């Protein structure tokens, strides 16, 4: 149970692929102009990570060590192709928005890295959980960045959600404030870099505060009964 919890915590927070490892920054920065695009690419990446980790872990005993990387890439490419066809068939608007970044998941360092570092050494169930956790962590980072850029740039949230979820999702669109002149800095690549930098700083501050609280709690437990540690 502790190993399962550790895999989840590592994927979502401690070893977040976007905010800690800084992997897959090209699609992270390019696609997150809206919350819908960010969520779409994040879900696709999560699905690819989960399925490839599961497949590679299942086949790990029959994979020759000398040619394991080409085999991993072939498995990843097959899964990405299937996901790309699904998006093309059921979410064509999103498929057009994401464009080349869907097939580029094949070369994403996150996917290959988890295959080599985790799936090739662990069992199928734990590997699938690792892929899902890493993908969910990346999706959360993409979604937060995409939401911030969309709100600041256009004053909306979930604009174009129907491209991802169907026509019913038009009701999800929220206009935070009205603007006739979008704030282009937030929508263009410089805004993505600035937003990511602020998110990295925010995570660092949260980690430092949590570390300080744990140190204070440990110090209090170490004190003899009846002492508070106050002067």
Curated annotation (Swiss-Prot):
<feature type="transmembrane region" description="Helical">
    <location>
        <begin position="18"/>
        <end position="38"/>
    </location>
</feature>
<comment type="function">
    <text>Part of a membrane-bound complex that couples electron transfer with translocation of ions across the membrane. Required to maintain the reduced state of SoxR.</text>
</comment>
<protein>
    <recommendedName>
        <fullName>Ion-translocating oxidoreductase complex subunit E</fullName>
        <ecNumber>7.-.-.-</ecNumber>
    </recommendedName>
</protein>
<dbReference type="GO" id="GO:0022900">
    <property type="term" value="P:electron transport chain"/>
</dbReference>
<keyword id="KW-0813">Transport</keyword>
<keyword id="KW-1003">Cell membrane</keyword>
<feature type="transmembrane region" description="Helical">
    <location>
        <begin position="125"/>
        <end position="145"/>
    </location>
</feature>
<feature type="transmembrane region" description="Helical">
    <location>
        <begin position="63"/>
        <end position="83"/>
    </location>
</feature>
<keyword id="KW-0812">Transmembrane</keyword>
<comment type="subunit">
    <text>The complex is composed of six subunits: RsxA, RsxB, RsxC, RsxD, RsxE and RsxG.</text>
</comment>
<feature type="transmembrane region" description="Helical">
    <location>
        <begin position="86"/>
        <end position="106"/>
    </location>
</feature>
<dbReference type="InterPro" id="IPR003667">
    <property type="entry name" value="NqrDE/RnfAE"/>
</dbReference>
<feature type="transmembrane region" description="Helical">
    <location>
        <begin position="182"/>
        <end position="202"/>
    </location>
</feature>
<dbReference type="GO" id="GO:0005886">
    <property type="term" value="C:plasma membrane"/>
</dbReference>
<dbReference type="Pfam" id="PF02508">
    <property type="entry name" value="Rnf-Nqr"/>
</dbReference>
<keyword id="KW-0997">Cell inner membrane</keyword>
<keyword id="KW-0249">Electron transport</keyword>
<keyword id="KW-1133">Transmembrane helix</keyword>
<dbReference type="InterPro" id="IPR010968">
    <property type="entry name" value="RnfE"/>
</dbReference>
<keyword id="KW-0472">Membrane</keyword>
<comment type="similarity">
    <text>Belongs to the NqrDE/RnfAE family.</text>
</comment>
<keyword id="KW-1278">Translocase</keyword>
<feature type="transmembrane region" description="Helical">
    <location>
        <begin position="39"/>
        <end position="59"/>
    </location>
</feature>
């Amino acid at each position: 149970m502790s190993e399962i919890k550790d895999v989840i915590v590592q994927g979502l927070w401690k070893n977040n692929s976007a905010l800690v490892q800084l992997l897959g920054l090209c699609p992270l920065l390019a696609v997150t102009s809206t919350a819908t695009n960010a969520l779409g690419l994040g879900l696709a990446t999560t699905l690819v990570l989960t399925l490839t980790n599961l497949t590679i872990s299942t086949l790990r005993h029959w994979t020759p060590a000398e040619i394991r990387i080409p085999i991993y890439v072939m498995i990843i490419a097959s899964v990405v192709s299937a996901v790309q066809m699904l998006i093309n068939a059921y979410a064509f608007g999103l498929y057009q928005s994401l464009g080349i970044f869907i097939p580029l998941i094949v070369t994403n360092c996150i996917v290959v890295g988890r295959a080599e570092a985790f799936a090739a050494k662990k069992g199928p169930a734990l590997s699938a959980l690792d892929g899902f956790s890493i993908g969910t962590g990346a999706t959360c980072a993409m979604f937060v960045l995409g939401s911030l850029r969309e709100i600041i740039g256009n004053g909306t949230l979930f604009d174009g959600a129907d491209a991802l979820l169907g026509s019913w999702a038009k009701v999800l669109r929220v206009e935070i404030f009205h603007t006739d002149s979008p704030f282009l800095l937030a929508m263009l690549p410089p805004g993505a870099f600035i937003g990511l930098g602020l998110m990295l700083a925010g995570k660092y501050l949260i980690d430092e505060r949590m570390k300080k609280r744990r140190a204070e709690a440990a110090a209090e437990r170490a004190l003899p009964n009846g002492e508070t540690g106050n002067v």
